[in-house]
Amino acid sequence: MRLATDLETPRRVAVLSVHTSPLAQPGTGDAGGMNVYVLQTALQLARRGVEVEVFTRATSSADAPVVPVAPGVLVRNVVAGPFEGLDKNDLPTQLCAFTAGVLRAEATHEPGYYDVVHSHYWLSGQVGWLARDRWAVPLVHTAHTLAAVKNAALAAGDAPEPPLRAVGEQQVVDEADRLIVNTEVEAQQLVSLHNADRSRIDVVHPGVDLDVFTPGSRDAARAVFGLPTDQKIVAFVGRIQPLKAPDILLRAAAKLPGVRVLIAGGPSGSGLAQPDTLVRLADELGISDRVTFLPPQSREQLVNVYRAADLVAVPSYSESFGLVAVEAQACGTPVVAAAVGGLPVAVADGVSGALVDGHDIGDWADTISEVLDREPAALSRASAEHAAQFSWAHTVDALLASYSRAMSDYRARHPRPAARRSGRRFSMRRGVRT
């Protein structure tokens, strides 16, 4: 048996995030949990002495080519296609240009500069596949979501994922040296839907910043947004799109007189076509006087959103994990979530909140009411205790183990001279070779 101590730790990792930048504001456009994941894991890796370069597509002429984020972490904005107006479904046409930008950046380093390529989402996997072959290093891939899973649980008005994506995902699954998933459910989906080799899959739970997302004064948090202190508040945080199902919360709230709804997020995906849909729905349901809409919030303000709420609802039709659920619980706020994907892991049913099977409005209203009636102090403590197990430090422990396995297995299959890893070390802190 190979011991963990026998495994090699990478010096540098090239992280690919084609369609969305880790520096983008979550809750806007295509920015969401994946952005948080990429940024937080990069920061944690750097704290362990692993240098990280994140490659993402530039979306503005104002984007600097290289952005130092923290010691050991760089974001490279690669020019590939028009800066604005390019839909995510059109990005496959720009993968050649993006790949060229990535390879050119690597060519400025000495051979063997990166030890691992980690791609996020299938678009990045296509680029990572080529980079892996060019650089002779292992490819680790995180899908985050799968087309087949999303298409099997489409919400009304949501657009199905294109066949091109399903084909691309299969190619990446076949080519990746290791596959990282959020939960065992996702691992089984890769096996059943894409015939993935289970021995190449590592389950790595995402985390939460337990130094930022902490319990605090509910009244003080409500004062930040001018919210009343004498009403029960149920919050929704995330992108406004059919997949996330914020309409389910509004319809359930219509059956719960006295409950106020707080929605924080911006339109995304199919929701971009009708950004005012929820506002109109609240009017139609006659609850517009007890619904507050907020734009996407910074992390610091998001903490106040969670603290202000008595409960956070996550009614998604599909969710590979559910970072919002864990962030809310870390703030001591219980969660009512759909029993889909990774949410049964993110939420401890009956302990830190409740899970709802399906999207029947009556079931959602009843479950929200039942959780709101529980003893709040005990529920808040249980929520924070459950979230405490999901730290980014734990995530990176598992991530490093996966990287090490990928490197060891790759070297066993593709021996190369030790000189490949030699050469001058590059300091991302100063941007020069040393």
Swiss-Prot record:
Segment Disordered: which positions? 414-434
Which positions, given as ranges, span the membrane?
none
Write out the entry's keywords from A to Z. Glycosyltransferase, Magnesium, Metal-binding, Transferase
Q: Which InterPro entries match?
A: Glyco_trans_1, Glyco_trans_4-like_N, Mycothiol_biosynthesis_MshA
- Catalysed reactions, semicolon-separated: 1D-myo-inositol 3-phosphate + UDP-N-acetyl-alpha-D-glucosamine = 1D-myo-inositol 2-acetamido-2-deoxy-alpha-D-glucopyranoside 3-phosphate + UDP + H(+)
One Gene Ontology term of the biological-process aspect is: mycothiol biosynthetic process
What GO molecular functions are on record for this protein?
acetylglucosaminyltransferase activity; D-inositol-3-phosphate glycosyltransferase activity; magnesium ion binding
The positions annotated for binding Mg(2+) are 306-307, 309, 333
Binding residues for UDP-N-acetyl-alpha-D-glucosamine, per the UniProt record?
A: 25-26, 33, 239, 244, 297, 319, 327
Q: What EC number(s) would the UniProt record show?
A: 2.4.1.250
Pfam families linked to this entry: Glyco_trans_4_4, Glycos_transf_1
Segment forming the signal sequence:
none
- Domain of life, source organism: Bacteria
Q: Where does 1D-myo-inositol 3-phosphate bind?
A: 19, 30-35, 88, 121, 145, 165
SUPFAM superfamilies named in the record: UDP-Glycosyltransferase/glycogen phosphorylase
The family assignment reads: Belongs to the glycosyltransferase group 1 family. MshA subfamily.
Subunit structure as annotated in this protein's UniProt entry: Homodimer.
> Function of this protein?
Catalyzes the transfer of a N-acetyl-glucosamine moiety to 1D-myo-inositol 3-phosphate to produce 1D-myo-inositol 2-acetamido-2-deoxy-glucopyranoside 3-phosphate in the mycothiol biosynthesis pathway.
Q: What is the protein's name according to its record?
A: D-inositol 3-phosphate glycosyltransferase
UniProt source species: Mycolicibacterium smegmatis (strain ATCC 700084 / mc(2)155) (Mycobacterium smegmatis)
Name of the gene this protein is made from: mshA
